Amino acid sequence: MNVKEANILDPVQDTLDQDVFNGTTPKKDFFDYHLDHIGEVFRQHGFNKHAFDYYLTGSLCTYQYSETSDVDISIVCNLKSFDEEDRADLISIVVNSLDGEFFPRTLHRYQHFVQPHGVDIYDLFSLGMRAAWDFQKNDWVIKPDRSKAVDVGKEKPDWIATGIQFSDKINSLIDANKYEDAKSMYKIAHQRRKEDQVIYGDYSEGNIIYKFLDNNGTFDRLRNIGQRIA
């Protein structure tokens, strides 16, 4: 399962990010364009966009974000025939064709998380996700709650949740022999660690994610496919 959450040392804001939202509603024109873009990329690779549901998740669905927080799109497949090989193929596609694109007029980059078969959006809340927007219903699955972004000590589960998702993404790619894509994901995690440490020091989301990947054996698997771990 994949879920991206807030860096808990990001400032707590009075509103959701108004570069991304109109009040508490995601900016429809921008997201409609991006969802159409996802659909076209899927079509080019033999996937039907209508077989999937799409959700806005992560730190931008909370009151705790920064100007560089990712725009996280969780992708849930509705087909029983969607297996781990299909999922790995789709993860590779989003890594190469969708991840890293900027949300218009911001420093926010898109990041896409393809969920395993059988996982629905409600399963993600058990990993620490706090809010999500349903693009199918144009409504909140669970609304943002500013009170949940106040106590830094209680936010640590969000770091671990993000580490779980990075690990899942990397290991899925390794299992599918998509080694270069797995290495690309490592480079993203490494760069994020460096950037977070410059701003926040060792007690930062990027550093905790990096240590999680080391502790749970993901880095050992990356070393086995030739990735140098810094």
Segments predicted by a language model, with ranges:
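Catalytic core of pol beta-like nucleotidyltransferases
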Residues: V3-S69, V76-A230
